[in-house]
């Protein structure tokens, strides 16, 4: 169980790193992210004001995201451990992760975008970016789990 908890902690860190890199201003996905947040239409002063307004609550947002990422990574570690204990290959977790992404993650992201406020031109970009980010994160966590179990 200690290994599964460690996978959860490492997975939360992996998720934070992937998200930071994925949505940085240096990537196309980061530029799309700023567009659908409306930051591309703001002046530098307005951007600075929005960032200053958000700073006091950012620790809560990041803490909540780390907890959610821990839960996801813990589940991947648990499934990998359970599979190996029952005679299955650890690599089966890659299949599980892709199927979880196809069956749950991508549809939920799609629903949020479909019923959300994304502009038509950005909706598909947002769907591709957000769902691909999740898939990359899940596969990296699965890789760590297969190396540790």
What are these regions (language model features)?
Residues 1-149:
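Juxtamembrane/disordered regions of integral membrane proteins
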């Amino acid at each position: 169980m200690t290994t599964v908890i460690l996978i959860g902690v490492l997975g939360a860190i992996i998720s934070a790193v992937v998200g930071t890199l994925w949505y940085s201003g240096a990537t196309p996905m980061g530029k799309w992210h700023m567009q659908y947040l409306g930051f591309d239409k703001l002046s530098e002063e307005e951007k600075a004001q929005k960032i200053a307004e958000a700073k006091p609550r950012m620790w809560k947002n990041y803490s909540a995201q780390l907890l959610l990422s821990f839960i996801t990574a813990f589940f991947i570690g648990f499934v990998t451990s359970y599979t190996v204990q029952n005679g299955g290959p650890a690599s089966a977790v890659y299949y599980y992760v892709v199927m979880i992404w196809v069956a749950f993650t991508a549809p939920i992201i799609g629903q949020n975008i479909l019923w959300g406020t994304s502009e038509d031109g950005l909706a598909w970009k947002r769907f591709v970016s957000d769902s691909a980010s999740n898939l990359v994160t899940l596969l990296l966590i699965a890789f760590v789990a297969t190396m540790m179990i």
